[in-house]
C-alpha cells in the first residue's frame, strides 16, 4: 500500500493560481494522475527558488519599440510588475537582469526598483549567469529564469524553474516548466513572482 506521503488531495495544494485542475483524490485511493504529478513536481521546484533572473525585452516589455523622429527608442513596462519586484526584494529574494539591450531608460527603471545585478548588452547569457551565481552564492538549483527568445535557452536549460511569457517563441515554450498565461510587458513578471512568494508564504498581507 502506498504511504500517506504519496497521497495528494486537493486541499493539500496551495491556491496560487496555477493553470491546472487538480481533482479530488479520496484518502483511500492514493493514485496520482499525470497532470497532478506534474503539478506537484512544479510546486516542489517553486519551493526551492531563492532567486530570479529575467530577460527584459519581451518579458518586462511587450517586444514593441517606439521610434521617435530623433531616433530615440522607447519601451513601456507594467507598473504591477514593478510593484512585486519591490516586494520580492524586500522578502529577501535576489533578482538579476541579463539583457541583450542597452537602454538607459530601462536600466534606470529597473535599478530604481532596487535591482543591483543588472547586465546589459549581453550576447551570450550563460557566462554572465554563471558569474552571477558565483557572486551571489546561489545555485542554479535555486534559480527561476524567465525569458522569451532563443538567446535565453542556454540559461533556461540550467535552472530549476524555467519560465516564459505566453507569447514566447515556440522553441522556448517547448522547454519551459511554466508558461505564464500573460504576455511580455503585461504582468508575466508579477505572475511568476507572485506564485513563488505565495507558495513559500512570503506574499505580503494587507
Task: Go through each PLM region and give its residues.
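Short secondary-structure boundary segments
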Residues: 56, 100-101, 122, 166-169
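Non-catalytic pre-domain segments flanking phosphatase-related domains
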Residues: 1-54, 205-206
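Short coil/turn segments at beta-strand junctions that form active-site/ligand-binding loops
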Residues: 48-50, 93, 141-142
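Asp-based phosphoryl-transfer active-site loop
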Residues: 48-65, 156, 189
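Substrate-recognition element of Asp-dependent hydrolases with the DxDx(T/V) motif
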Residues: 85-109, 156
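Basic, amphipathic juxtamembrane/active-site segments
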Residues: 64-87
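Mg2+-dependent phosphoryl-transfer enzymes with acidic/Ser/Thr/Gly-rich catalytic loops
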Residues: 71-78, 112, 117-119, 126-206
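Short, basic/glycine-rich phosphate-binding loops at helix/coil junctions
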Residues: 60-67, 107-113
Amino acid at each position: 500500500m502506498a504511504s500517506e506521503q504519496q497521497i495528494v488531495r486537493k486541499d493539500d495544494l496551495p491556491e496560487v493560481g496555477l493553470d491546472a485542475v487538480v481533482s479530488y483524490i479520496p484518502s483511500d485511493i492514493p493514485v496520482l494522475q499525470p497532470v497532478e504529478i506534474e503539478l506537484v513536481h512544479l510546486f516542489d521546484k517553486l519551493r526551492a527558488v531563492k532567486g530570479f533572473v529575467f530577460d527584459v525585452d519581451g518579458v518586462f516589455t511587450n517586444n514593441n519599440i517606439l521610434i521617435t523622429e530623433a531616433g530615440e527608442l522607447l519601451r513601456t513596462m507594467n507598473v504591477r510588475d514593478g510593484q512585486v519586484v519591490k516586494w520580492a526584494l524586500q522578502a529577501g529574494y535576489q533578482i538579476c537582469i541579463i539583457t541583450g539591450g542597452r537602454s538607459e531608460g530601462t536600466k534606470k527603471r529597473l535599478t530604481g526598483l532596487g535591482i543591483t545585478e543588472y547586465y546589459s548588452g549581453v550576447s551570450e547569457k550563460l557566462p554572465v549567469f554563471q558569474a552571477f551565481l558565483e557572486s551571489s552564492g546561489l545555485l542554479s538549483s535555486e534559480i527561476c529564469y524567465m525569458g522569451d527568445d532563443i538567446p535565453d535557452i542556454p540559461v533556461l536549460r540550467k535552472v530549476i524553474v524555467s519560465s516564459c511569457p505566453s507569447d514566447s517563441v515556440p522553441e522556448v515554450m517547448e522547454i519551459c516548466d511554466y508558461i505564464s498565461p500573460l504576455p511580455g510587458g503585461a504582468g508575466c513578471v508579477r505572475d511568476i513572482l507572485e506564485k513563488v512568494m505565495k507558495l513559500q508564504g512570503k506574499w505580503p498581507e494587507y
